[in-house]
A protein has these predicted regions:
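Long, domain-scale functional regions
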Residues: 60-378
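Conserved "repeat-terminator" motif of extracellular CCP/Sushi domains
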Residues: 41-61
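Short structured motifs
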Residues: 2-4, 42, 334
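Append "Rare intracellular matches occur via the same short Y/T/C beta-strand/loop motifs
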Residues: 15-19, 51-58, 350
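Well-ordered beta-strand positions in beta-sheet-rich domains
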Residues: 6, 42, 53-55, 128, ...
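Conserved N-terminal submotifs of small, disulfide-stabilized extracellular modules
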Residues: 1-12, 26
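Surface-exposed coil/turn segments at beta-strand junctions on protein surfaces, enriched
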Residues: 8-12, 38, 47-49, 341
């Protein structure tokens, strides 16, 4: 938009116009045929000695995915060993892996520049998140960090994973009838923790109009694969083999809103971080790990002393169902597990759509990435 559309000046004079970019563009010049200058929304052409027709274009606003890859220029590649914790301080660093054969990028160690400010809670307070990784759909996966980068209560509340631990089905985010994993994979009943998360979502992100920014194709893996009806897939990968994976084998364990990429059982595009994602980020089973998912920007525990739930089943002992989680300050960042009937911290995970644009920031705690407000989310 340009105002006015034309100006008259004397020989060697100057003219100014008020210009504003359309949605999806920012007030920075991409092309500029008259060699003018832009300050804020004022475009100025000096030393005019003849009639001129001027044309300018603005730079497009980058997607968060594009900005993330442009900013994080250190690329160590794929990690080859997950037997030791990774807690090294780092910035501008992205590691690589794959999800469904597609390259994805993730933060590991004590990354200090994976902060995002996105959304508001029901009280109108800004919400802060940590970037976990990119998804195979090009989206950006985030972990909840409350209303401050220095939060020591970065969870939406406490909840049991399920109200009882007395059946193998209770390792499930959703389950069908009881008695077996095959029955559990019918996915007709919400877990206790899913109800907690969904209720928070409707009162906060949905109520404030932020659903349009979130991916419905992102997969949240509640991996219930088991060869012996005792230990589940994540336990074997992370305790026995030390080989985390972003892949989710069984469609019934792929919790999604959209049926094109998973089971389509989610009503809302929100769930939890997985134990495999913690391992990629630098955690190791039953070892302390003061990595980015544990720390706040003041280098303290994001959840104080509170243990918080992950999405990954650990084991069925024959009488108790156990699910993975992360310990608070009494055993810092330790990837552990607990009986599902205990009430522990709930830190939701969401995924921004691949087309979501950033309005600024560099990912640091002082300048977190911010999201451009748009009508469609893109």
């Amino acid at each position: 938009m340009v105002s006015p559309s034309s100006q008259v000046t004397g020989y060697n004079g100057s003219v100014s116009f008020t210009v504003s970019p359309n949605s999806g563009f920012k007030a920075e010049l991409a092309t500029n045929t008259c060699g003018g200058t832009l300050s804020g929304n004022t475009y100025r052409v000096s030393n005019v000695t003849s009639n001129k027709t001027c044309s300018i274009t603005f730079k497009s606003t980058p997607t968060l995915y594009t900005k993330l890859l442009a900013d994080k220029t250190t690329r160590p590649g794929a990690r080859t060993s997950f037997s030791s914790v990774l807690t090294t301080d780092n910035t501008k660093t992205l590691y690589t892996s794959t999800e469904n054969g597609i390259t994805v990028y993730y933060f590991a160690g004590n990354a200090t520049d994976n902060w995002v400010k996105f959304g508001k809670n029901s009280s109108g307070a800004d919400l802060f998140w940590r970037i976990i990784r990119t998804n195979s759909d090009g989206g950006i996966r985030l972990l909840y960090h409350g209303t401050s980068t220095t939060a020591t209560d970065a969870y939406i509340g406490t909840s049991a994973f399920n109200s009882s631990a007395s059946n193998i089905a209770y390792v499930s985010y959703m389950y069908g009838s009881l008695g077996s994993i095959a029955n559990a994979r019918e996915n007709t009943n919400n877990s206790t923790i899913k109800t907690t998360i969904d209720n928070w979502y409707t009162s906060n992100l949905e109520a404030k109009g932020y659903t349009k920014y979130l991916s419905t194709t992102a997969v949240y893996c509640n991996d219930r694969s088991t060869s012996d009806n005792t230990y589940f897939g994540a336990y074997t990968r992370l305790n026995t083999n030390k080989t985390p994976s972003y892949d989710c084998t069984d469609t019934n364990d792929k919790f999604t809103v959209d049926t094109s990429t998973g089971n389509g059982k989610l009503t809302y595009p929100i769930a939890l971080m997985t134990a495999d994602e913690v391992s990629f980020a630098g955690g190791v089973f039953v070892k302390n790990a003061e990595t980015w998912y544990y720390k706040n920007s003041a280098n303290g525990s994001s959840t104080g002393s509170t243990f918080w739930w992950l999405l990954s089943p650990n084991d069925w002992s024959g009488s108790y169902a156990h699910v993975f989680g992360v310990n608070g300050s009494y055993s810092p960042g330790n990837l552990d597990y607990n009986g599902v009937f205990f009430a522990y911290g709930v830190r939701p995970a969401i995924s921004l759509k691949s087309c979501v644009k950033t309005s600024g920031g560099d990912g640091s705690a002082n300048a977190p990435y911010t999201i451009l407000d748009t009508e469609t989310g893109c």
